[in-house]
Amino acid sequence: KISSNVSVFPTEPEADPLHGWLRSMERIRDTVPDDVLVLPAHNEPFIGLHARLAYLGQGHRVSLDRLRRRLAQPRRVVDVFASLFGRAIDEPRLLSLATGESLAHLNYLVHRDEATVSVDDDAVAWYQAV
C-alpha cells in the first residue's frame, strides 16, 4: 500500500516532520473512532483506522531501528536509502522523495540526540549514531 511521504524540504533543512507526523497519528487515534470509513488518497476506502495507524507507526519505528544500526559508521543521506526503503533508489523521479523522507528520519534522530550530523569541506552532510 502507498503511505504518506513524510519529507524534509529544502526550505526547512533542519525540520523534524516525522515527529509531527507521528504525534498527529496519536491525536487522530485518540479522537477519531476506529469504525469510521477512511477515504485515502490512494487505494480503496476502508474501515479500521486504528489498525492502519498502528501499522504505519510501526513501519516508521522499524525504519528508525534499521537506520540507527546503519549509522554505526558515518553515512550520507544517499547511503541510507537501502536501509529505509529496502532497495537502491535508482529512478531519478524517486530521488527527491527518497532524499526528503530519509532526511526526515535522520533529522528525527538528530533532534533526539540519537545521531549527529557534521558537514565536511565539500559541504556534504555525514550522519552517525551517538
What are these regions (language model features)?
Residues 1-64, 77:
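Metallo-beta-lactamase
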Residues 66-130:
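C-terminal regulatory/interaction regions
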